[in-house]
Amino acid sequence: MDRKLRIGLIVVVVLALAYPAASWVIGMSVQHQLLEREGQATERLPYLAVVKRDYRRGVYSSTEEVTFGVSASVLKSLQAAGQDWGQQAQFTVRNHIHHGPLPQLRAFAPATIDTEFVLPPEAQQKLLAMIGDQAHLSIHTEMKWAGGSTTLVHSTPVKKDTPGQGGFDWRGLDVKSELGRAVGTQATEGTAPGLIVTSSQGNVSIEDLKVSTDVHQAFDELTIGKGRFSLGHLAIDAPTPVFKLDSRNLTLQVDSSVTGDFVNSGGALSMDSLEVPQFAATQLVWEVRMDHLHGPSLASLTKELRDAQAAQVRAALQSGPNDAAALAQQQLQTTQKIVTAFQTYGLQILAHDPIIEMPHIGFKTPDGDLMLSLKLEAPGLTPADVSGDPKALVAVLPQHLQATVNARIDSALLEKLLGQILPDSDKSNPVKARLQQAQDQGYIKVDGKALTTQVTFMGGQLKINGLPFAPLMAPPPPPPQAPPGKKPAPRKRKD
């Protein structure tokens, strides 16, 4: 036999014998990674708890079934939304795992995973009755040799019409998620063309939904990075009670970063247009920033809040959803833990000069514009100020608190809003009188067709437009009116 041929045969035999062993070892590593990631997920999602896990490992493939329990608060939200199958407090995730190094001879990877959701029987029946068997959801994950994974989620479009009841048109979903080697590192892109639901109770239309994230972990507990959510069009039309909503290009953006021991974060919610009964506006925006947040304290606060909520979920699953007394006791204990966490770590954040700012809040209407801004900080507070008696903190805080509020509103818009909020002139006239009194005192300024004011609190003093604030006295009552046909009595002259 040719020497090269013999060597080739030997290599093939060695590989054939070694492949099962390699696949078995890789399967053990994959199992460890999955358990670790599931533990991290439940830590970051305190509204879920693992009820049961079954992992059946083979040489070339494995199957994992994980049953999660849902918190009582989530169930109440489902019930409020009319989903009576929300009584089911559990759902199961089933993973079909194919070990590498050549899983199913379709990839060169440690493993590939195909995931499916197993709903409770009642929920499954309702879902089938709603959408039939047309829908198909695929979740495919390919793990990486250097750590991390790539997950692709695809949902097929589904359209169903029920005569006399309505229908829906789901246009599909595509998501790609990249998990990095480092814990908490993730980048996600997702798109959903839209959903249209019609029924006798109303119609809902959602178009052009997009989601993206690029985040990593900081201080072991915090998620830092960028995120964006956008919705091209949202329309709601309900006949009873009559309600209509139409919004265009809704966008939510968040961004956070770390500098030393401090976290800087911000977010902006904006809409090109919004129309609801008695109100229509364009260029709506609400920006929020929270800067110089002490990272270690914020991480500890986040962990305590998650642990409190997770403990409540575990206790609720043990006692059952129908034990009202136990659920009430669990809620009380959770509330006490949350209060304690804020008293401890929230005050530590306050002692490191945080800054809260809303630099831009506003919108435009045919009647005029509204613009607001706000900034809060309390520089100079020390850990000693916040670690003692809360009454002492209340006493010292006004000396450090610095607050500024700027407001500008067009007069015509203010007039319209007052008319909608206080349609009764007996109630609106006193408000208008107080506004005029504030204008006369310099607390409100006229800038063209708009009214402006600036409110500041510094050094324990409240000022409006730079003037020390004195509580506005109630305007004098109007003179009494004589009955029709009768002249008012003449006033007596004083000699």
Segments predicted by a language model, with ranges:
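N-terminal positive-inside, membrane-proximal cytosolic segments immediately preceding the first
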Residues: M1-L5
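Glycine-rich, small/hydroxylated-residue low-complexity segments
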Residues: R6-I10, V14-D495
